[in-house]
Amino acid sequence: MNSRDPFPDEELRRRIMDFIMAAGQTLLENGAEVFRVEQTMEIMARSFHLREFHVYVLTNGIFASAGTAEISEVRNVPVRTTHLGRVAAVNELSRQIAQTGMTLDEAESRLVLARRIPFPKDWVQLVSGMCGAFCFALIFGGTLRSALAAALAGFLASGYLLLCEQHELPGGFCKISCAALITLVCILACRMLGTPASHSIIGSLMILTPGIAFTMGIRDFVHGDYLSGTIRMIDALLIAASIAIGTGLVLSLYTFFTGVVVA
């Protein structure tokens, strides 16, 4: 059975549909933009001669049909992480499918490999959080001692987020508690080092800010995907609110019990 047959039979069409849906799901759950997911799926459908293919993508779901709606499929994508390596691998796969005579069997094998690309090791994420917090503290006008306090907070916060991910804790709780942890560590560390804590707190909190969600929301708006853009913007606002709640709670309690306003 030739997967590049201009007129694939029903069994092959269903296989092609399953492959395209799996590719779209891989893109969406790893941080790709909605318009890019739709575009990539349409390219794959044309390349494999899946006629009358229509797809509608939201931030947490994919709806697609082929033929005269004789084949239709819906996939829920509740989990959204960020792994641009997987996104790049699937995009490259779609280009090769369009430009070469890659068979469906080979494409399915390549997609499995793309979905198995591992996340960075835990120690890389810990060091990245520490370095990011250190640099942001300096960027926002902090001293070297403030940056060192921020680095400690960034290291601990990255470790805490990894634990939350392993135990599958709710995202809102993780963000609130992590922001509270960062604020507390920065206050205590800066008090020991004799330096103001504000720059340390701001620099450390930057590793929690929803930059990707906010940027993706704007891009979705620009491409006319208003519903997906609204969902992403709400997601970004909820994360920002969680950070504010966690930080404000610790600052308020510290001032209440010590009578000292954090500067």
Segments predicted by a language model, with ranges:
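Soluble N-terminal domains of membrane-associated systems
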Residues: M1-M102
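Generic detector of multi-pass transmembrane helix bundles and their immediately adjacent loops
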Residues: R191-A263
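Alpha-helical transmembrane segments and their cytosolic membrane-interface
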Residues: V79-S146, D235-A244
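Cytosolic regulatory modules rich in charged/polar residues
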Residues: F35, E106-P120, G172-F173, S198-G203
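C-terminal ends of transmembrane helices
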Residues: R110-A114, A157-E168, A213-S228
